[in-house]
Amino acid sequence: MSSPSSLTQRNPTSSQEQSESVPQLRRQTSQHAVMSQTLTSAANLANLLPTGTLLAFTLLIPVFTSNGSCDYPTQVLTIVLLTLLSISCFLSSFTDSVKAEDGNVYYGFATRKGMWVFDYPDPDGLGLPNLSKYRIRIIDWIHAVLSVLVFGAVALRDKNAVSCFYPAPEQETKKVLDIVPMGVGVICGMLFLVFPARRHGIGYPVTGDGGRR
């Protein structure tokens, strides 16, 4: 039977190990939380894309790729589809919406001097607010490029699109296809947080003008 003195000698060591394990456990928990938040942000990247473009991609990519089993003609058609959808993401960053005096919301395309409202019934623009504040800015070009990169990341995470061009990828290629879209998506998501979008164009939710520059 162990003597009381031996027990007192063991207890400090045990308590020291416990005290050292607590910070380590906290660090692991913090790392898991950061990783979980990063993956969640990457999974929500699709919310940064125009709804119509994302819907078209979701519906058409299985058809164009034959569910991932592509031959040369379907590969060409898939490239054309992805190119058109990328252009759609790029141009959608320059669209915006405006609320007229009649209470209706109208859409237009930003220009260097203001905005061209293409669905407003009055060609003179009577009843519209001052459109000069809707002109193109440098941030719009940044958002346009980021939108294309985000779409590319989403496309590379789609199994049909990847299988179309890489039906049997090597181990190194597979790692690149797993890492690059995630990295691009996370970086673009962070940049969208730093440079938030203030336009509410086609395919994006419409809000008030309170955040307008």
Swiss-Prot record:
Q: What taxonomic lineage is listed for the species of origin?
A: Eukaryota, Viridiplantae, Streptophyta, Embryophyta, Tracheophyta
Any transmembrane segments, and where?
45-65, 74-94, 136-156, 176-196
* Chain residue ranges for the region called Disordered: 1-27
- Cite the PANTHER family for this sequence: PROTEIN DMP3
Q: In which tissues is it expressed?
A: Expressed in leaves, siliques and roots (e.g. root hairs).
Topology of this chain in the membrane: Multi-pass membrane protein
- Pfam families per record: DUF679 (PF05078)
Entry superkingdom? Eukaryota
Q: Which GO terms describe its biological process?
A: endomembrane system organization; plant organ senescence
Any one Gene Ontology cellular component term annotated for this protein = endoplasmic reticulum membrane
The entry assigns this protein to a family as follows: Belongs to the plant DMP1 protein family.
Organism of this sequence = Arabidopsis thaliana (Mouse-ear cress)
What keywords is this UniProt entry annotated with? Answer: Endoplasmic reticulum, Membrane, Transmembrane, Transmembrane helix
Enumerate the subcellular locations listed in this protein's record, separating them with semicolons: Endoplasmic reticulum membrane
**Free-text function comment from the UniProt entry:** Involved in membrane remodeling.
UniProt KW Plastid keyword: no
Report what the protein is called.
Protein DMP3
